[in-house]
């Protein structure tokens, strides 16, 4: 193709923005499901809310594992989609499913054998542990359903089928919210079940999600046709070595990176939790609005991984470079827009809360900081995860996260909070600093184009 700095292909923009919009809506609905659970349990009982929150720490780890395996599947499958091959997609999807099932089984076994020990990692309160154990007893089975659903939806996303995921998220929100309302509070003649009712609502929603996605993949999907052959074909026996080697080569670095980040979050929360009560309240409020805008950034990264992988699979390296440059500039523009929105809306948003004057001042300062952080995150996350990792270079992201989070951010945050005892605004900057300084190494790696890795070795 003729060398140009930015792509002029309208189909590229249509594909990218379609994927981004649907993924963003799906993520927004999924985030709202968690918010709804917290609101309902919070209005029922503080111990119930805290018990569910501790179990959600375990679910967060499961979620990160599922996302990592799904991202690995997308990185590989999108390249085959670009080269119009679907048989290898079926093989690598089945490998990812088997790996996910093994991990889910291991986590569920731990939840059955040592539930109190697991929950005790996050709290020492006997009342909260009791509520959390009740919740975990039901929720643990949803880990399996969630991992299967997530993998099948990742497979569909890799071939640019995304609307079904949004539909499932909406149905899940309605079902979960409805059952929660009835069973938590005992409405319409149902027994008042408290935290058990919330767990049953989540269980029912996850079962329904899995049922819908299985039906869609089996009966409606005309692209991959996952069930057109025996499940063992290609992943057990002759020729299966290449499938597993390719999958683990991509998956292990992504999984390691995700787990390193997931483990760091509770530690960052603990650092912020040692600040004053006003600072903790301010951080909670500002983080809520920040997370809603972050949903858009995550969607951008997800859409980018699909379009870049598809371009690599079609053997158009110059096209990959051109589209990558176009996307990187789009990221900056979107980041500036999101940062400006957060900055301008901070006063109207804060007016909805009843905070102390000091907490309001802190929240205002935090949202100004988050406005700048948003610009950096809107660039580094989509380039790092969407383009570089989506292009097959998974080890770079792993090493970058290892160094930035564990060698810089965590020590810096600890020193800022406990040794130097800096103002709370500077502590928040330290905790979020990787969103800014990762931009430089990510930009340099992107400009080298060494992230373009061909992953299509499966027959």
Protein language model regions, located:
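Transmembrane helical elements of multi-pass membrane transporters/channels
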Residues: 18-37, 138, 149, 172, ...
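Helix-terminus/linker motif at the lipid-water interface of multi-pass membrane proteins
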Residues: 28, 32-50, 119-126, 182-193, ...
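Interfacial/gating helices of multi-pass transporter permease domains
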Residues: 41-60, 126-131, 195-196, 242-250, ...
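Short runs within selected transmembrane alpha-helices of multi-pass transporters and secretion channels
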Residues: 70, 139-158, 165-176, 198-214, ...
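Short alpha-helical transmembrane segments in multi-pass integral membrane proteins
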Residues: 1-23, 77-144, 191-251, 308-374, ...
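Alpha-helical transmembrane segments and their lipid-water interface positions
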Residues: 30, 34-37, 41, 63-70, ...
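Transmembrane alpha-helix boundary and packing residues in multipass membrane permease domains
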Residues: 23, 27, 38-39, 75, ...
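Small-residue-rich hydrophobic transmembrane alpha-helices
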Residues: 49-109, 146-165, 269, 280-346, ...
């Amino acid at each position: 193709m003729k060398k140009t700095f930015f792509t002029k292909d309208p189909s590229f923009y249509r594909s990218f923005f379609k994927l981004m919009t649907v993924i963003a809506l799906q993520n927004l609905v999924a985030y709202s499901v968690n918010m709804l659970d917290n609101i309902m349990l919070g209005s029922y009982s503080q111990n119930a809310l805290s018990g569910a929150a501790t179990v959600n720490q375990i679910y967060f780890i499961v979620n990160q594992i599922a996302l990592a395996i799904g991202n690995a599947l997308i990185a590989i499958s999108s390249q085959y989609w670009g080269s119009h091959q679907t048989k290898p997609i079926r093989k690598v999807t089945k490998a990812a499913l088997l790996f996910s099932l093994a991990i889910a089984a291991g986590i569920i076994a731990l939840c059955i054998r040592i539930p109190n020990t697991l929950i005790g990692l996050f709290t020492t309160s006997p009342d909260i542990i009791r509520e959390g154990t009740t919740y975990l007893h039901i929720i643990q089975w949803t880990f399996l359903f969630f991992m299967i659903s997530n993998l099948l939806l990742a497979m569909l996303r890799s071939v640019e089928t995304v609307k079904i995921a949004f539909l499932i998220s909406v149905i899940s929100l309605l079902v979960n919210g409805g059952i929660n309302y009835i069973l938590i509070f005992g409405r319409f003649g149902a027994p008042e079940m408290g935290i058990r009712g919330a767990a049953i609502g989540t269980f029912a929603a996850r079962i329904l999600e899995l049922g819908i996605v299985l039906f869609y993949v089996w009966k409606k999907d005309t692209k991959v046709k996952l069930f057109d052959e025996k499940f063992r074909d290609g992943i057990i026996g002759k020729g299966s070595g290449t499938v597993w080697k390719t999958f683990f080569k991509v998956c292990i670095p992504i999984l390691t990176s995700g787990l390193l980040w997931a483990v760091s979050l509770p530690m960052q929360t603990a650092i912020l939790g040692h600040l004053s009560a006003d600072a903790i309240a301010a951080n909670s409020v500002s983080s809520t609005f920040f997370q809603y805008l972050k949903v858009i950034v995550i969607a951008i990264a997800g859409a980018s991984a699909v379009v870049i992988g598809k371009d690599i699979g079609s053997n158009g390296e110059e096209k990959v470079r051109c589209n990558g440059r176009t996307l990187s500039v789009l990221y900056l523009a979107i980041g500036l827009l999101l940062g400006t929105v957060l900055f301008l809306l901070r006063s109207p948003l804060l007016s909805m809360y009843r905070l102390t004057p000091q907490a309001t001042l802190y929240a205002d300062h935090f949202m100004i900081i988050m406005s700048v952080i948003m610009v950096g995150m809107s660039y580094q996350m989509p380039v790092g995860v969407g383009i570089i990792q989506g292009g097959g270079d998974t080890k770079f992201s792993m090493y970058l996260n290892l160094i930035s989070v564990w060698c810089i951010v965590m020590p810096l945050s600890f020193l800022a909070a406990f040794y130097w005892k800096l103002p709370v605004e500077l502590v928040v900057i330290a905790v979020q600093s990787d969103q800014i300084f990762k931009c430089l190494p990510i930009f340099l790696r992107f400009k080298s184009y060494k992230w373009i890795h061909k992953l299509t070795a499966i027959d």
